[in-house]
Amino acid sequence: MSKINKLEHIRNIGICAHIDAGKTTTTERILYYTGKSHKIGEVHEGGATMDWMEQEQERGITITSAATTCRWQDKIINIIDTPGHVDFTIEVERSLRVLDGAVAVLDGVAGVEPQSETVWRQADKYNVPRMCFVNKMDRMGADFYRCVEMLKDRLGAKPLVIQLPVGIEENFKGIIDLVKMKVVIWKDEALGAEYFEEDIPADMKDKAEEYHAKLLDMVVELDDHVMEKYLSGEEVTAEEIKRLISKGTISAAFYPVLCGSAFKNKGVQPLLDAVVDFLPSPTDIGIVKGMEVSTGEEKDFPISELEPFAALAFKIMNDPFVGSLTFIRIYSGKITSGTTVINTVKNKREKIGRMLLMHSNNREDVKEASAGDIVALAGLKDTTTGDTLSDIDQQVILEKMEFPEPVIELAVEPKSTADQEKMGLALSRLAAEDPSFRVSTDHETGQTVIKGMGELHLEIIIDRMRREFKVEANIGAPQVAYRETITKACEIDYTHKKQSGGAGQFARVKIIFEPLKDVKDLKDEDKIFVFESKIIGGAVPKEYIPGVEKGLNNIRETGVIAGYPMIDFKATLVDGAFHDVDSSVLAFEIAAKAAFREGMPKGNPKLLEPIMQVEVITPDEYMGDIIGDLNSRRGQIQSMDPRGNAQVVTANVPLAEMFGYVNTLRSLSQGRAQFSMIFSHYDQVPSQVADIIKAKK
């Protein structure tokens, strides 16, 4: 690849949206028009290039975010196609972490849907500049202006409309470019590859003028010189408008909104122009946060080829031909095949073997990669998602990624002894690929338990185990990942003493356990368990205090009510005692565990269950039955809103009550209603339900 691969020529973007908004189709069209794909792949025919796993082609949904490199004008665009199904939000989360910009695809009929909100919040968390593409403008009921309003109302976003649709529904034929003030019309017979510009027709002139004025009002605020020019009645040039749209997009002052129909091949080239004109290059982002290993100091590192090498591993994938592939985003410096780097999170050296540029599931070998690139490395031994690879002499750890807690679990058993060993290998490989998927062993039953983000998530894991690793397994019924917490503060003073000839063990700890105030948001890792030491005067020597924290952290995995992990509490070590000879880190670890066992029952412990935010879209006539059914599932209705000729019901419902809901909804609505759900928060289980759960344990 030639040296135009310079930082300002690169765009690392994600394409993210709600399931079925047409995201993969949009990506397919981008690959087609940038010359990467010689034939258009249709999702509903199971032929999309980006959806390369067998399950994806069967189900018509994108599960793993395939990374693809293509070119437009003189720019290189690295695209991560992310899944829109709620069970795969982890894929979205980790791709957003390494992107510089994103395109949010909205369904022109449905507008902002629950998963659109989730993705938007995730993009906010990583400060990803983005633009919106209102897709499916050719569909019955498509309403561009309503989508723009929903961006304001539902997401609190500040949309900047830079295009208007020409024609509605099946008569949609092009767009008005509000920067150039021209109409762009596509020729149907040329598969969208040919289009022409013309003057705005008289019947749309007023609307175009109105939106052009709104656009100018918003962008001139970013530049005093242009503002003066505008206010004094001088014309603001198209180049000035473009520069200011780019400036505002990168600073998240607003979000440009475009429209089109990817399926009907309209609006994709202007979307590509907008990606290269308005979304940031790595140099616009400028820095990446991290920690210098030698000093432990947090600092901002410049994104530059001239700096020492630093990259973040954001995805592991098993490729049937190459083996394990680790996708990395290089933030600074460069690497060549044969170089040795260090994984600073695990403190292990890794030798760089094959380096690949990926086009969906085709691959191109490269010998060198540098800052701004997204490449796949073959054969790394110890690197997992979220790890940093760094120059050996100047080591850094880049900002870590956070992964959500799983909310559902299943027991799996191999069907035969031959499957036993293969299953262990398969599950550990799949867990390395996907941090939101966990594997553990139930100590009481000896069963292997797999945990994930939803029924579909685990279904696909089991399917992959069968197809890719040829493992046959028996699957148990899904179980809810309950948690436990305390509701009042309690104090425990515990002494651990063991004397049996030779060296003994001695440790005394006095710990206050108290509930963390906000139980609601489990997404913030800090709220699960907080430990603090208030030891004064060396009652417990400094070197023993980590033993107390380690003991509590281990024991909290088995709560005191029904053995579920304990969360949302703080433990403060306030006093203690030690013995010069008999005390050790281990003795304090044992004392902390025993203090937990004795102290927690005094804190009025309660069971917590995951609550899901459920959104049901249904024709009017089934509303009553559907609401009645949600109420019977201990659901709390949050809102009911009309959307086109349908009703949207939003409710908070315990996950335990939602198993098999898809079949119930189908029969209640004769298959006409649809639903989606996302994890909302953990809440206390009502006492009569808690008794049943305890009895089952």
Curated annotation (Swiss-Prot):
InterPro entries: EF-G-like_DII (IPR053905), EFG_II (IPR041095), EFG_III (IPR009022), EFG_III/V (IPR035647), EFG_IV (IPR047872), EFG_V (IPR035649), EFG_V-like (IPR000640), G_TR_CS (IPR031157)
Localization, UniProt: Cytoplasm
Residues at which GTP binds: 17-24, 81-85, 135-138
A single GO BP: ribosome disassembly
MF (Gene Ontology): GTP binding; GTPase activity; translation elongation factor activity
Organism domain of life: Bacteria
Keyword Coiled coil recorded: no
GO annotation, cellular component aspect: cytoplasm
Keyword presence, Nucleotide-binding: yes
Membrane-spanning intervals of the chain: none
Alphabetically ordered keywords of this record: Cytoplasm, Elongation factor, GTP-binding, Nucleotide-binding, Protein biosynthesis
Chain ranges of the tr-type G domain: 8-283
Family of this protein: Belongs to the TRAFAC class translation factor GTPase superfamily. Classic translation factor GTPase family. EF-G/EF-2 subfamily.
Purpose of the protein: Catalyzes the GTP-dependent ribosomal translocation step during translation elongation. During this step, the ribosome changes from the pre-translocational (PRE) to the post-translocational (POST) state as the newly formed A-site-bound peptidyl-tRNA and P-site-bound deacylated tRNA move to the P and E sites, respectively. Catalyzes the coordinated movement of the two tRNA molecules, the mRNA and conformational changes in the ribosome.
Protein name in UniProt: Elongation factor G
Organism: Rickettsia rhipicephali
Lineage: Bacteria, Pseudomonadati, Pseudomonadota, Alphaproteobacteria, Rickettsiales
UniProt gene name: fusA
